Every structure is written in structure tokens, then in C-alpha cells.
Amino acid sequence: MNDQTTGPVATEMLLRLDSVLSPTKMDLTDDSEQHRGHGGYNPAGESHFSLKIESAAFTGKSRVERQRMIYSALGDLMHERVHALSIRAAAPGE
């Protein structure tokens, strides 16, 4: 996990992903400041993220299936708090 991303939204995202997907590797970065002045930007931050995640749960799953699993794990955060999420999801060994 990434200790540099410690805001309340990022913390909740990491907890949910860890609980549902049991990742072997996970890195979540808050990219919000790079989107200042763009649509969905929140001055409070924590609106735009990049996620790199490796989980055995992704074995045999397509890219779209993996993204759906992540969105499902994040639930209401994707609708209420997170404007954009860039995802790199892999199974171990990929």
C-alpha cells in the first residue's frame, strides 16, 4: 500500500480494496492537483486517483471484468467522492 496517500477518501479506498480483493501489491496515488481547473476537480483534493493493483482475484479475468471488480469494491465512493480513477490491474505473474 502507498503510505503517501493518507487522506480519508484514499484510506477508505485502500481498506475496501484490501478487504474485497486481498491484493498482493497495491499503490494508490492522489493525482487531484494535476487536474486543477479541470472538470470534477475538488479543491479539497482526493477526486482524481491512479491505482496499480495486483490480486489473484484477477486471474482469468478480462481488463473490463477487473475494472468492474474494483468499481464494485469501491461502491458509493465512485459515485459520491471520486471523479476519476486510472487503473492498472494485474494478476500475479503478469
Model segments located where?
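N-terminal, polar/charged subdomain of small-to-medium soluble alpha/beta proteins
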Residues: 2-94
